[in-house]
UniProtKB/Swiss-Prot annotation:
Disulfide bonds: 53-67, 60-71, 66-78
Domain notes: The presence of a 'disulfide through disulfide knot' structurally defines this protein as a knottin.
Keyword Signal attached: yes
Keyword field contains Ribonucleoprotein: no
Name of the protein in its database record: U-Asilidin(1)-Dg12
Keywords: Disulfide bond, Ion channel impairing toxin, Knottin, Neurotoxin, Secreted, Signal, Toxin
Family affiliation: Belongs to the asilidin-1 family.
A GO CC term assigned to this protein in UniProt: extracellular region
Remaining remarks: Negative results: the recombinant peptide has no effect on Kv1.3/KCNA3, Kv10.1/KCNH1/EAG1, Kv11.1/KCNH2/ERG1, KCa1.1/KCNMA1, and on the drosophila Shaker IR channel.
GO molecular function: ion channel regulator activity; toxin activity
Propeptide intervals in chain numbering: 25-46
Job description of the protein: Neurotoxin that may modulate ions channels (other than those tested). In vivo, induces neurotoxic effects when injected into insects (tested on L.cuprina and A.domesticus).
């Protein structure tokens, strides 16, 4: 589900980037340029802490959160 969301957001951003090339901006207006990664994080709302994997023993909800890719669901902890 999360990967589908990331792919969907990536496609959405690609369409926006392509359409922005054809749009004209008002003269003299300086807009901050964002990398695709920054724009994606702003849309999804991810912070630096959420992007880093969790170590063994740390709290988790799904396996993708753990560095080991294993989350013991009933204890809600990353395991080896």
């Amino acid at each position: 589900m999360a990967r589908l969301l990331v792919v969907s957001v990536g496609v959405f951003l690609a369409v926006i980037m392509l359409s922005s090339e054809t749009m004209s901006l008002p003269a003299g207006e300086n807009l901050p340029a964002l990398t695709l990664f920054e724009a994606q994080n702003q849309l999804i709302g991810l912070s630096q802490e959420q992007r880093q994997c969790k170590k063994i023993g740390e709290h988790c909800y799904v396996a993708d959160e753990c560095c080991s890719k294993r989350c013991l669901f009933y204890a809600a902890k990353c395991v080896s």
